[in-house]
């Protein structure tokens, strides 16, 4: 049976970068769910939110997640930050045969620094004007989302780890 590794975490937590490095290291296919959606839809996530709204996005996000899960190959899937929090996506993730879900836990301060210069390219935070507003938004959002993120099989605090160290730690945890 083919193995699936789900990377879960808040936007800016490094899921895509870590997923690429991990998949290369263990010779698995890598899929970034947001990139998979934009490739198949032919427009960016921002454009989907603007033109078709969030409800449409969450519907197709679930459909594309199912499509990736059903690919018959060993794979690492980097999820969108909100993916586990909508519909019964977290149940789907946890009930996927031969899978591991990994929450890449980052501090609020790390996320603020990482996201502040990318605000305009992130639909959920594009309206924020200052680091203080961003910090408050992330704090509230994480409080809401942690009930989903913390259901992951593996929780890895990545705050003080370099990329290479995160990948090595994940390989150890995955056996």
Where do the protein language model's features map onto the residues?
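P-loop (Walker A) phosphate-binding loop of NTP-binding proteins
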Residues: 10
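A glycine- and Lys/Arg-enriched "phosphate-lid" helix/loop adjacent to the NTP-binding pocket
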Residues: 97-144
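NTP-dependent small-molecule kinase module
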Residues: 2, 25, 129, 143-175
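Walker A/P-loop
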Residues: 16
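Hydrophobic anchor at the beta1->P-loop junction of P-loop NTPases
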Residues: 7
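ATP-binding Walker
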Residues: 13
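ATP-dependent small-molecule kinase phosphotransfer cores
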Residues: 35-94, 109, 121-123
């Amino acid at each position: 049976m083919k193995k699936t590794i789900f990377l879960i975490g808040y936007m800016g937590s490094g899921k895509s970068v870590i997923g690429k490095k991990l998949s290369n290291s263990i010779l698995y296919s890598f899929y970034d769910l947001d990139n998979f959606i934009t490739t198949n839809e032919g427009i960016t996530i921002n454009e989907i939110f603007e033109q078709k709204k969030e409800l449409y996005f969450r519907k197709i996000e679930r459909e594309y997640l199912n499509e990736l899960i059903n690919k018959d190959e060993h794979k690492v899937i980097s999820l969108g930050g909100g993916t586990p929090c909508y519909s019964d996506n977290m149940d789907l993730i946890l009930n996927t045969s031969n899978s591991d879900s990994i929450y890449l836990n980052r501090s609020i301060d790390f996320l603020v620094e990482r996201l502040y210069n990318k605000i305009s390219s992130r639909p959920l935070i594009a309206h924020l004007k200052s680091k203080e507003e961003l910090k408050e938004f992330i704090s509230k959002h994480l409080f809401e989302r942690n009930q989903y993120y913390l259901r992951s099989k593996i929780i890895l605090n990545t705050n003080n780890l370099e990329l290479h160290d995160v990948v090595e730690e994940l390989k150890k945890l995955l056996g």
